[in-house]
Amino acid sequence: MDTWHDALGGEKQQPYFQEILNAVRQERLSGQIIYPPAADVFNAFRLTAFDRVKAVILGQDPYHGAGQAHGLAFSVRQGIRIPPSLLNIYKELETDIEGFSIPAHGCLTAWAEQGVLLLNTVLTVRAGQAHSHALLGWERFTDTVIRQLATHRKHLVFMLWGGYAQQKRKLIDSQNYLILTAPHPSPLSAYRGFFGCRHFSQANSYLSRHGIDPINWKL
């Protein structure tokens, strides 16, 4: 199994998946603003090929502010103010990765292109309404994504930040993967253990031990 089409082609034919796409399409047609734009909803899969995934960082649902979401968890487009959770991720990187300096932007495309799957478990949201698409059925699809990676790939790193992401641990066989958990990088919880977790250097050490090129976290 080498491609996302191999891994997810059957899932995309399931009635529930077609119902999700139709529900989102109907909301857009009715004038509801939905983020990310339709062309960006599956960006995580477009930028990170199935057979090139090295690490998975799980988010919840997309940013719901104008111009922010572009299909990658925690990432925002160039020119958009860096959100607080991402700024805290950068602060942890600054202490964890030698030579990392906090960039002036929040675009994580360079990580995605190196094999970091930046996966939100819910892939769309209404403008200004956090979790508004939480019940559409996206999680059934993204749970399948996690299961397929955990079944058909080896030596991946899963970064699960916060209780919500950590619920997905049950989908992963920990014997063949590195599962890293910490509080969410949100300002509400980062000081409870996200700061100091050193997940980025741990990920690179694990990848190197298994003969996999480490990730250049610098942006």
From Swiss-Prot:
Cellular component GO terms held in the UniProt record: cytoplasm
Catalytic activity: Hydrolyzes single-stranded DNA or mismatched double-stranded DNA and polynucleotides, releasing free uracil
Coiled coil (residue ranges): none
Catalytic-site annotation from UniProt: 61
GO molecular function: uracil DNA N-glycosylase activity
Top-level class of the enzyme under EC nomenclature: hydrolase
HAMAP family, alphabetized: UDG
Functional description taken from the UniProt entry: Excises uracil residues from the DNA which can arise as a result of misincorporation of dUMP residues by DNA polymerase or due to deamination of cytosine.
PANTHER family for this protein: URACIL-DNA GLYCOSYLASE
Assigned protein family: Belongs to the uracil-DNA glycosylase (UDG) superfamily. UNG family.
Protein name according to UniProt: Uracil-DNA glycosylase
Organism whose genome encodes this protein: Neisseria meningitidis serogroup A / serotype 4A (strain DSM 15465 / Z2491)
